């Protein structure tokens, strides 16, 4: 019972780290990448579809992304979605491809993105801690019900705390890496 609780907690903590990693990928750095567009959705045949499922991406230059839609009919919708996103770019459409040139990030904008990254990291840490709290409650309930002994309950809580520290540490490492990436000129 306790092993199941700990395994479930670990899976949820891994998922929280993965979501944080995906959130970081969507934050623009000095170099654009296809992941920059992963959170942008387009209405395509009545369904909201991520841009990265509607087109292929190439990065021919450090500050340019070329988007080649699989369906040319989706081009205006993709262009509009990118223009209205919070990327701060103006895509140009030549009929076959969409070119997106990213301006250099100003120091102010870099610091803004660092704040966004810190907020996303804190959200991730909070998710991990919430998972810990839920698992701890389940362990406490099992001890009170007499399903497990107090010693086993304490051992399980120590394991849970170690898991929590491990995954919070992973999020902190991701944040440190993202901050250095953002502040690199």
From Swiss-Prot:
Q: Which GO terms describe its cellular component?
A: cytoplasm
Sorted alphabetically, the keyword list is:
Cytoplasm, Protein biosynthesis
Where on the tree of life does the source sit, at the highest rank? Bacteria
Q: Does the keyword Membrane apply?
A: no
GO terms in the biological process aspect are: translational termination
One GO molecular-function entry: ribosomal large subunit binding
Quick one: where is this thing mainly located?
cytoplasm
The compartments listed are: Cytoplasm
Q: Entry's Pfam families?
A: RRF (PF01765)
Q: Which HAMAP family match?
A: RRF
So what does this one do? Answer: Responsible for the release of ribosomes from messenger RNA at the termination of protein biosynthesis. May increase the efficiency of translation by recycling ribosomes from one round of translation to another.
Q: Which family does it belong to?
A: Belongs to the RRF family.
Q: Know the name of this protein? A: Ribosome-recycling factor
> What species is this protein from?
Thermobifida fusca (strain YX)
């Amino acid at each position: 019972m306790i092993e199941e609780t700990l395994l479930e907690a670990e899976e949820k903590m891994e998922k929280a780290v993965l979501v944080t990693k995906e959130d970081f990928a969507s934050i623009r750095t000095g170099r654009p990448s296809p992941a920059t567009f992963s959170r942008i959705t387009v209405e395509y045949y009545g369904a909201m579809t991520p841009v990265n499922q509607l087109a292929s991406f190439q990065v021919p230059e450090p500050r340019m992304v070329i988007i080649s839609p699989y369906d040319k009919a989706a081009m205006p919708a993709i262009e509009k979605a990118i223009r209205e996103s919070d990327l701060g770019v103006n895509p140009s459409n030549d009929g076959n491809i969409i070119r997106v040139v990213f301006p250099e990030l100003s120091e102010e904008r870099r610091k803004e993105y660092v704040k966004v990254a810190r907020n996303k990291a804190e959200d991730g840490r909070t998710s991990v801690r919430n998972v810990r709290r839920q698992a701890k409650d389940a362990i406490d309930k099992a001890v009170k019900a007499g399903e497990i002994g107090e010693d086993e309950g304490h051992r399980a809580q120590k394991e849970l705390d170690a898991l929590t520290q491990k995954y919070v540490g992973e999020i902190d490492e991701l944040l440190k890496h993202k901050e250095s990436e953002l502040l690199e000129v």
